[in-house]
From Swiss-Prot:
General function of this protein: Key component of the proton channel; it plays a direct role in the translocation of protons across the membrane.
Entries under HAMAP family matching the protein: ATP_synth_a_bact
GO molecular function, one term: proton-transporting ATP synthase activity, rotational mechanism
Protein name: ATP synthase subunit a
SUPFAM superfamilies reported for this sequence: F1F0 ATP synthase subunit A
GO biological process, one term: proton motive force-driven plasma membrane ATP synthesis
Pfam families registered for this protein in UniProt: ATP-synt_A (PF00119)
The keyword Transmembrane helix is annotated on this UniProt entry: yes
InterPro entries in alphabetical order: ATP_syn_F0_a_bact/chloroplast (IPR045082), ATP_synth_F0_asu (IPR000568), ATP_synth_F0_asu_AS (IPR023011), F0_ATP_A_sf (IPR035908)
Amino acid sequence: MAATGDALTPQGYIQHHLTNLSVGEGFWTWHIDSLLFSVGLGVLFLWIFRSVGKKATTGVPGKLQCLIEMIVEFVDASVKETFHGRNPVIAPLALTIFVWVFMMNFMDMIPVDWLPSLALLAGVEYLKVVPTTDVNITFSLAIGVFVLIIYYSIKVKGVSGFVKELTLQPFNHWAMIPVNLLLESVTLIAKPISLALRLFGNLYAGELIFILIALMYSANWAMATLGVGLQLGWLIFHILVITLQAFIFMMLTIVYLSMAHEDH
């Protein structure tokens, strides 16, 4: 697919598919496609769950209701096993994270040329359809979790308790306060960074592999045939990847918030 109607080189093809539809420059650049798809999928998630919740019956449930109930029960069981405090927000938060991240990841299942080609017909030169291949989106999610970690740490332990946790662990001596503060600060900051980069790295790599496989179709019939097999194999494997990454993001969020609720 070409952005301007001319044939793209392999390098140009890859670069084109990895470029966001954006406005602004530098720090103030807005990735319009990532924002639209992430918000749109979030609204779709809310609409589906709200519709199923309103139509839920005690009789024989439909297929969609069964699926939703399975997801809710799975997330609820995960929260009960992992979160040791009492907070009615955690289970809905975990459900939202798991389903929303999975839906954003699932956009990677759409063949790489389909939506960008349609966008090109509408005059849109660039379009990335997988929000979690944008590090800005994954960091936004992780920063939201980080804010909750800080909030509940202070709410449960108090300001003084939170400060003591940062300055008197792991070495409980006033002389070791600078060392403790450094170690605990690094540990605290590493949580959102690891959350964001793990999700971004796995999905970005998966998207890149799909793009490389798509290049094989423009070579010759033998490479195109091989590409079909590779694409099918990677598609099956990638279903596991996108599900696992959504699960890991959810579980780490629960673990971090459980740690924030521990009052030493």
